[in-house]
């Protein structure tokens, strides 16, 4: 993300202050996600100052689809609630919640209302809007933020030293690194070390979803020539879910 943002500093010359919108997904690793967002803002401001750019970053944060599930779908509400909490405490400027049924239902009033009400509960009943930067001063979060920032800065410098983001993107290096990380997480899930309740642990074998699908909830691939090999969005539970659907 930061290496990508740097390409704007390299190629866009503007005298007036600008705002760069960064779209970030968050998962259920609660404190990690809080620290991740804080580290992104910290490093963005650091890099912008090094480029003598008076730019601000506007963080648009949304829950990831990576850990969302088709079966026992109500658990998705719990996942998105903690993810939105992380987004708030991490300093997100805008939060776009994900409806619990977004994987298999078309946009609908009920799913959208639940997603909206989750944020309203955090605001009006948990009072998340009453304190600015509520995670400031927490030793654990501050320490984790600094650790993530240090590691991210090393990775950023490595990308810049090897030609920058666009060069590595064109050469497939960025895609390969992301794929390697995704494969490691998938292996953990397949081995039962990464848990999704209701899917690979405590699954309800009586759940039936085949006749509720309004949308195709799995990876779609349409082979065609591209300048850059695309990064394909894929959820952890797809293989298990496909096997269960075939048995219904």
Which positions does each model-derived feature cover?
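Helix-rich catalytic cores of soluble enzyme domains
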Residues: 1-87, 99-116
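Residue-level detector of short coil/turn "hinge" positions at structural boundaries
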Residues: 16, 51, 55, 93-94, ...
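Histidine kinase transmitter module recognition
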Residues: 87-88, 121
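Short acidic/histidine-rich active-site segments
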Residues: 91-105, 128-135
């Amino acid at each position: 993300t930061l290496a990508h943002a740097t390409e704007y500093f390299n190629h866009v010359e503007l005298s007036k202050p600008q705002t760069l919108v960064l779209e970030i997904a968050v998962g259920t690793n609660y404190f990690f996600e809080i620290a991740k967002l804080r580290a992104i803002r910290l490093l963005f401001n650091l890099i912008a100052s090094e480029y003598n750019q008076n730019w601000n970053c506007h963080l648009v944060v949304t829950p990831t689809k990576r850990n969302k599930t088709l079966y026992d779908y109500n658990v998705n509400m719990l996942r998105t609630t903690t993810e939105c909490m992380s987004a708030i405490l991490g300093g997100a400027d805008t939060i776009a919640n994900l409806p619990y049924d977004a994987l298999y239902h078309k946009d609908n009033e009920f799913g959208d209302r639940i997603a909206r009400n989750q944020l309203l509960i955090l605001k009006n009943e948990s009072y998340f809007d009453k304190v600015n930067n509520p995670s400031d001063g927490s030793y654990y979060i501050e320490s984790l933020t600094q650790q993530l920032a240090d590691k991210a800065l090393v990775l950023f410098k490595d990308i810049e030293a090897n030609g920058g983001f666009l060069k590595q993107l064109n050469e497939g290096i960025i895609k390969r690194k992301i794929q390697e990380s995704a494969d490691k997480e998938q292996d953990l899930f397949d081995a039962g070390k990464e848990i999704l309740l209701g899917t690979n642990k405590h699954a309800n074998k009586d759940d039936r979803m085949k006749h509720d699908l309004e949308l195709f909830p799995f990876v779609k691939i349409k082979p065609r020539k591209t300048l850059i090999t695309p990064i394909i969005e894929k959820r952890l539970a797809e293989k298990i879910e496909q096997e269960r659907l075939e048995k219904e």
